[in-house]
Structure formats: structure tokens, C-alpha cells
Amino acid sequence: EAPLVPQEELQSITQSLLASGADIVEMNTIRKRLSAVKGGRFAQHCAPAKVFSIVLSDIIGDPLDMIASGPAYPDSSTCADARRIAEQYGLRLSPEASQCLERETPKVLDNVETLITGSVRELCAAASAACRELGYEPVLLTDSLDCEAREAGAFLAAVARAHQDTERSLAFLAGGETVVHLTGSGLGGRNQELALSAAAGIAGLEDTAVFSLGSDGTDGPTDAAGGFVDGGTKERLARQGVRIFEVLKNNDAYHALAACGGLLHTGATGTNVNDVAVLLIRR
């Protein structure tokens, strides 16, 4: 990375966007303009030399100009897009950062070849194969999950309740990347929040569980990759005086899941191809 603004300001802008619920495309539209190499500028610096780019996609739909902020791909976003995002989320920018948003990125690059070697589709396929090996019939709900984390959890809980009469063991999978609009001061991540939201909806259901995790082994500013809950999670937390909806309001899923043994720890995986959430119904 070669930021055009002080590292502290870049981190502050990124944290502000995260806290406001900005999605990865919006974040990268801003970040590529604050970098000397992102937004196609790396390939521009290399010209006329040829650049061969091998890409792991962590963005739904594999937009090459947005993955890792597109250092070796023409940028489809504009200065007007960046200004709109900055205004929408009320970003506080220094004069230097504001000037960066007005510098257009390369729109044409003829010295680049690109190969995508992995994405959320491969993640979902691998997860489906693992579920099948464990005796579950996999059902892919979507590989483009893109909504509020707690809404995704509530949706998986609704799917669970709708399939309680099944005679087969089922695994419903959803790949993608949810967002969290922070309303509290707790600790957690989007996968932990998704799982805890699902716990409220599957409460009391036997042989039913939900887990959600980030493929990079990190979920939010925590040491966990995600969370795991089952039909008894809500009751176990209630016995400790923990109310799920109060926890979600404070965005404190980490501590709630820690209290009931529901945190998933994988360590750094060395890759990043979005997240996967899985609903398991065992028969």
C-alpha cells in the first residue's frame, strides 16, 4: 500500500465507513482514491510492462476494479461517486484527502491480464461438499447474500421453522457478505451478529443449528471467525441474564457468544472469499 494521506487518517476514514454500514464497494471507491497504487494506478505505473494479475475475489459478483480496490484494473467509479459517498456517510476529511477524491483514476488500461482463482462460489461449493460428506443434503440459498446481518439471521431462522417437518438432514447455505449498522458500543462482527440473531428465531427447535464465519478467519475487530448457535442458545443465555435483543441493540454479540461457548476460532486462513452462513437441520 502507498497511501496519499497519513496512515492514521486512512484508518479513521475506514473505521467511519465500517461503523456507518457502508458496503465494500462504497469503501473501496473512497480508499482507491486515497492510494497511489489502487484504482488501476499500480498497472498505470508499470506501463508499458505487462501485468498478469491473479485474483482471489472477496466481493460479490467479482467486480475486478473493486477487489483489493483494483490496483491492476481500470476503475469504473468516478470522483462524483466518491463525493456522494463521502457526503452520504458524513466523512470528515482533511483538505489533502478531499483533494484526493477529486483526482480521477485510470479508466483504460491495455497492459493487464487477469485470472480469478477463487470466489464465494468456490467457498459455497466446498461447504456444500463438506455438508454432504457429513450426511446433510445441501441447499444453496444464495451466493450473493448482501443485507443487514441480523436480517440474514432472522431469515435463516424462518427457513429453519419452515422445514421442521423434513425427514432428511438438510444444510441450507448462504454465501456473501452482510453489513452491520452500529447502534451500540459492544464488540462483535457481522457473522457473530448473524448467528446471534438466528439464535432468537430457532429457540426451542431441536437438532437445529446455525453457524456463520468469515473465510479469512476474522470477524470484525475480534479474535473470532464467527459464531455458532442452536435451539438452546437463547435459553442458556437467559439463564445467565443475557437477553439477545438487548445484546444485538448494543452490537455486543462477541461477549454473548463467549458466554455460551458459541464463538468460532479458526485463526488466520490466508485467504478471503467472503463469508458463509449455514443452517443445519439434523434428522
Feature-to-residue mapping (PLM):
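Short Gly/Thr/Asp-enriched flexible loops that form oxyanion-binding sites at enzyme active sites
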Residues: 1-10, 184-191
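Active-site segments that bind and position negatively charged phosphate/pyrophosphate groups
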Residues: 135-212, 220-221
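Solvent-exposed alpha-helices and their adjacent loops that cap or buttress functional pockets
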Residues: 35, 43-49, 58-59, 65-67, ...
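Internal helix-turn-beta structural module
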Residues: 196-283
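Accessory alpha-helical/coil subdomains and C-terminal extensions
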Residues: 49-52, 74-155, 164
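General beta-strand structural signal in soluble alpha/beta enzymes
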Residues: 24-29, 56, 67, 75, ...
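Internal gly/pro-rich beta-alpha loop/helix module
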Residues: 3-95, 101
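Alpha/propeptide regions of enzymes that mature by internal proteolysis
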Residues: 4-24, 137-139, 201, 235-238, ...
